[in-house]
Amino acid sequence: LPAAYGLARHPGWLSRLLEEFISLPLAVPGLALALALLQLYGSMKGFRASWAFILVGHVLYTLPFMVRSILAVLAAMDLKTLEEGAASLGASPWQRFRDIVVPNAMPGILAGALTVVTLSIGEFNLTWMLHTPYLKTLPVGLADSYASMRLEIASAYTLVFFVMIVPLLMAMQWASARAQRITQ
């Protein structure tokens, strides 16, 4: 939210450049991103063996989707006028952000969050490169089960995948329809 807010609040060549920089992971395959992370942080054994390492990879991979989702909602409203109105009533910058920006950006936050979670659950290449034997995510466990011909375990992984993804996709559709109704 802060990145999208900053980009929406201060348009110009610098914000366009920052937006392109934030969108860079869209042009880089997950495998290349994982290799870069391994090159940078692979020697840090404590960090490399923790779940935070995979989390950093997923945040970098999905950040553009979240920022663009929120930015689209913020760009559709007259943010400057809303903030000036709140400031004229004595609201501090923090109050304006909390009480004006966040509620108005909520459809974008919700749509972005659902998109990010759905992408993150299904991302295999990045996670496969970053995981350790003690840290397996759902896609890696599913692939390992099929590779070792443990079809009963693979079936259980598939069922868990299905139970997680279908409600998320339904929530994304609902959030998208709700956001369209709100903006019209």
Show where each model-derived region lies.
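C-terminal transmembrane helix and the adjacent membrane-cytosol boundary/short C-terminal tail
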Residues: 71-83, 87, 93-101, 155-184
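Transmembrane alpha-helices
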Residues: 60, 67-71, 79, 93-122
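Interhelical loop and adjacent transmembrane-helix boundary motif
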Residues: 121, 127-171, 175-178
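Loop-to-helix entry region at the N-terminal start of transmembrane alpha-helices
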Residues: 42-65, 108, 113
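Cytoplasmic-entry segments and transmembrane alpha-helices of multi-pass inner-membrane transporters
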Residues: 2-37
